């Protein structure tokens, strides 16, 4: 198994996530999707090293990260839907106007 090719793919996914955050700082949904892409790149690293050293701990961590990421996405999207219903926009520059 050639680990360097897969790590390159994981690094590209992670850098695409960072690039997506810095490129589009106005839309919170794109930022949330970029963060999820970064989490998936980290998951891929856990899985690759788990297979490479023949240990199942990395696979368990990847499963844990997937469940946390799914919960984070669901909560984030639910908050965005409520915020959109109240304000009528989900632009990042208006989110800092929230009080409480």
From Swiss-Prot:
One of its GO terms (molecular function) is NADH dehydrogenase (ubiquinone) activity. InterPro entries: NADH_UbQ_OxRdtase_chain4L/K, NUOK/Mnh_C1-like. The keyword Cytoplasm does not apply. It catalyses: a ubiquinone + NADH + 5 H(+)(in) = a ubiquinol + NAD(+) + 4 H(+)(out). The keyword NAD applies. The chain crosses the membrane at residues 3-23, 28-48, 61-81. It is found in: Mitochondrion membrane. Its EC number is 7.1.1.2. It is a multi-pass membrane protein. Complex I is composed of about 45 different subunits. Belongs to the complex I subunit 4L family. This is NADH-ubiquinone oxidoreductase chain 4L. The lineage of its organism: Eukaryota, Viridiplantae, Chlorophyta, core chlorophytes, Trebouxiophyceae.
């Amino acid at each position: 198994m050639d680990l360097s090719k897969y790590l390159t793919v994981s690094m590209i996914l992670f850098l695409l996530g960072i690039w997506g955050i810095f490129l589009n700082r106005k839309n919170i949904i794109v930022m949330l999707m970029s963060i999820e892409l970064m989490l998936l790149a980290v998951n891929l690293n856990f899985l690759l090293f788990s297979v490479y050293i023949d240990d199942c701990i990395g696979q368990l961590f990847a499963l844990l990260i997937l469940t946390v990421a799914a919960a984070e996405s669901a909560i984030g999207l639910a908050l965005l839907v409520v915020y959109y219903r109240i304000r009528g926009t989900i632009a990042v520059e208006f989110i800092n106007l929230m009080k409480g």
